[in-house]
Structure formats: structure tokens, C-alpha cells
């Protein structure tokens, strides 16, 4: 038990105080404002607080915070205080973004020191989303079962605050965070099917709190995973017999609630366990038996309910066989397929037919959800037919074309790892025709007339970035570059998920 506590306390050694005074510094809110501007979507029009925020509003907010009871932005202020009643949402957005910048400081300093200690010069190479898929392609083709887990999102507010206490020792900041969460939780969080949907005005703070909570949960899983290869072997006579399974379960639960983790470790000796998390989902894949996967399922349910005090329904964890299951992950639909090949072997006068089955990891783009996202962004209707997108009257033709080109290239860049490009061709067709209809609507002309005016050069502008790069690398072998483009291409410079991909 002491070893386990030491493992959890290892990354908490750097603790920082006196974060509360930073709330009264204007540059903190300027940093938050710049962060939102740099990361705003090019797909959706959003008149968020970055269009309304100004230094005058920030100064007014800081002035009010100096006054007594200034941080009470509740609904009652709409009657008692017209100023806050009119700008209630705007002030809460500015405050939450600024507070998120402050509480991220201890984590940022810890990350920098960790990278310096490990002598990692280019940490951005480790953050690419596409780097996950070569790992899955290399590992999952050798595994048999997968646990598809939907994380519980009904987390008590006090649990989130208690998690931060290990990192932030500033009591004033924690009290302020507790008050802010209790005031705004219901208005800023909208529970959806599986995960909470944070309001577009306040995503950074709540994503930070949720991820810090997930970090606490994953530290225990990582400890079990790292220790599993060093466990002593267990007798298989009783351990794997189904008749004694429920007896072992009772002992396992008692050991867990007594915090005796050494008994728990006996249950998880699996060098082939792999774990990946994305938003409110996580995947645990293993080469072991269904019985072993059921033990992991039971452990996860009890871990969330009795350690994190969050209700976790067993139905939110599904055990599936990889060869018959598709994983929706990061905008891709991944699966392990068996490719059969028949080989005829001739030995003297005898001939043999050998049937070889090879596992192959495939990733495709699910077209129906992607068309749904295009429909929400007003590029097409629900059936996938392109429509004109409303634009401002002062937008030039070059600005409209450039915006559509950036969207098309970003989507092609992100989905370059698809093993089948047919879905991408359809998406490019929708964006291209939507661009033409938008321009024709602006100039009050028909689509056919406007296409004749633009000519074939307009269609060539929608040539994807991958095709251009490969044509430069293989200028004399066009067929080679085309064949490479049709294959899977993973990039190491993708650090964020497209809003059109994030359709869940």
C-alpha cells in the first residue's frame, strides 16, 4: 500500500500557492481571449465572448470582484443589479476562461519540467492525434477482446475540487472554484447521450476539471498496468475455474474496499493490455479470455463507485470480440478484419491448398455522421445535397473560396488515414458544390452560369494537399503518387480534432 501511495504522490510533488491574486490581473484575461481567438472553429459561425470582450469589460469585472459579494452572479442579480443582470453570461464566460488559465499554471510547469528531465526537445511530436492509429494498427491486430467503456459524467462537484487540492494549495482559489461551480453547473453543463456537452462559452475550465479527474483515475490504471508484469505467477487450478469465480469476486471486493491493492494485483497479470481514452470513452484491449475481461469490468465499476463516488452502470461497459466489432474513435471507424488468401502448394505429385487468414486493422470514415455535421454547419441538407451557405455582404469571392478550400483541405488532411477514400470524395464534392452555390447566390446567378465563368481551374483548386505533396515527391511517376494517396497516410502535426469530426 505504501508503494501505491508513493506512486500517486510522485507527480504531485510540485505544488504552487498564491494563484488567487492572478484573478485581478488584466493580462490573464488577455491570454484567455487570445487562446479562444487562436482556437476558434473555421466551420461554425460563433458570436462568442471573444467578439464582445474588451479591456473595459475586464476592468469592470475586476472592479466588481474587489467589492463585497461581487462574485455572486446568480439569477437574483437580474433584479437587484441591472448591470450584472444584462451581462451575466458574458461575465461568467470571461471569468471562467481566466480562471482556467490560472489553474492550468501548476500543470504547465510540471509538464515543462518533466520534458526537460526526460530531455524531450520537441514535445509537439508526441501530441499528434494520428500517432495513436499506428499504435492501434500495430497492437490491435494481435489482440482478441476489447472493453468499450463509457465514462460516467455525473461527477459530484466536491470531488472535482478535492482532486485539485493535490495540485493547488491556494485555499482562496479552491473556495472560489467551489462557489462558481455550484452557481453555474446546471446552466453550463448539458448532459447528452454518453458524455456531458459543455457550453461553447465555457469549455476550457470544465474540460480541464474533467481531464484532471480522468488523470486521477488513469493513474491507478497505469499503476496496475506497470505492476502486472512483475507479479508472481498464480496457480491456475483454482484461479481460472468458473466454479470458484464468484468466491474470488467476494474476496476481490473485500480487498478493494480495505485498500489492500496487493490482492487486487493478483487479478490483473496481463502483459498484452492496452488502454486508449478519447473524450468520454475509453478502450481496453487484451489478448486474454472473456473471463479476464469480466474481471476488469467488475473492477472498473467498483473503482468508480467506491473510490470516486460516481454511479457507474455495468451496462456502460461492453465486452466485444475484435474481429466482430467496430470502434468509433477520433472520427474514424476502426475494425480488425480477417483477410483470407488461398495458396496452392505443389510437392512432387501431391498438391495442397492452404487457406491463410491474416488480421488487418482498417480505418474508414463514417460518412453518415460526417454528413450530419456538414448539415449542422449549413453546407448541405440532411440527405447530403449541397446548399448555399449564408455569407456577409462584404465578403469577397476570394475570401469565400479560400474558406471553403481551407475546410476541404483540413478535412482531407485529418482523414488521410482512411483505408477507403470514397467517403472523402463525397465530402469534397459537397463542399465544392456548396461553394459554387454560395457564390452564385451572392451574385444572383444560376449555378451552371457561374461554373462556366469559373472554369475548370476552380475545380483544380480543390486538389487536396496530399496529392500536391506526393506529386512533388514523385513528379515523373504520377501513378505511384496516386497509389500512395489512395493508401493510409498518418501525420504528426495534428494536435486538435476538427469540429466536423467531433460529431458526437
UniProtKB/Swiss-Prot annotation:
Gene Ontology biological-process entries: mRNA processing; RNA splicing; tRNA processing
Signal peptide stretch: none
Single GO term (MF): RNA binding
Keywords, sorted A to Z: Chloroplast, mRNA processing, Plastid, RNA-binding, tRNA processing
Gene Ontology CC terms: chloroplast
Protein localization: Plastid, Chloroplast
Origin: domain of life: Eukaryota
InterPro entries attached to this UniProt entry: Domain_X (IPR024937), Maturase_MatK (IPR002866), Maturase_MatK_N (IPR024942)
Family: Belongs to the intron maturase 2 family. MatK subfamily.
HAMAP family: MatK
Biological function: Usually encoded in the trnK tRNA gene intron. Probably assists in splicing its own and other chloroplast group II introns.
Name of the protein this chain belongs to: Maturase K
Gene (name only): matK
